[in-house]
């Protein structure tokens, strides 16, 4: 079953799903802006197109992840994103 989600007044939209190859996941698109997300479980984020400037929990420096790159976010944490252009992603819930 697909589940549609919308955050930050429609600037971030995702579709959640479960499959045998990825497990529980969501795909989505972020418009330009700055966002903070909280996690319940650990997440693996893959940038599909565009780029994300990311500040991970416990870090003091931002890091840019471009299309094809992956970063991991611990569970029970918050991470920050800066998005300069519309960017798509795949989020796997680990």
From Swiss-Prot:
One of its GO terms (molecular function) is thymidine phosphorylase activity. Its EC number is 2.4.2.1, 2.4.2.2. Pfam families: Ppnp (PF06865). It catalyses: a purine D-ribonucleoside + phosphate = a purine nucleobase + alpha-D-ribose 1-phosphate; adenosine + phosphate = alpha-D-ribose 1-phosphate + adenine; cytidine + phosphate = cytosine + alpha-D-ribose 1-phosphate; guanosine + phosphate = alpha-D-ribose 1-phosphate + guanine. It is an enzyme of class 2 (transferase). Coiled coil: none annotated. SUPFAM superfamilies: RmlC-like cupins (SSF51182). The keyword Transferase applies. GO terms for cellular component: cytosol. Keywords: Glycosyltransferase, Transferase. PANTHER family: PYRIMIDINE/PURINE NUCLEOSIDE PHOSPHORYLASE, PYRIMIDINE_PURINE NUCLEOSIDE PHOSPHORYLASE. Belongs to the nucleoside phosphorylase PpnP family. Catalyzes the phosphorolysis of diverse nucleosides, yielding D-ribose 1-phosphate and the respective free bases. Can use uridine, adenosine, guanosine, cytidine, thymidine, inosine and xanthosine as substrates. Also catalyzes the reverse reactions. NCBIfam families: PRK10579.1 (NF007875). This is Pyrimidine/purine nucleoside phosphorylase. It comes from Citrobacter koseri (strain ATCC BAA-895 / CDC 4225-83 / SGSC4696).
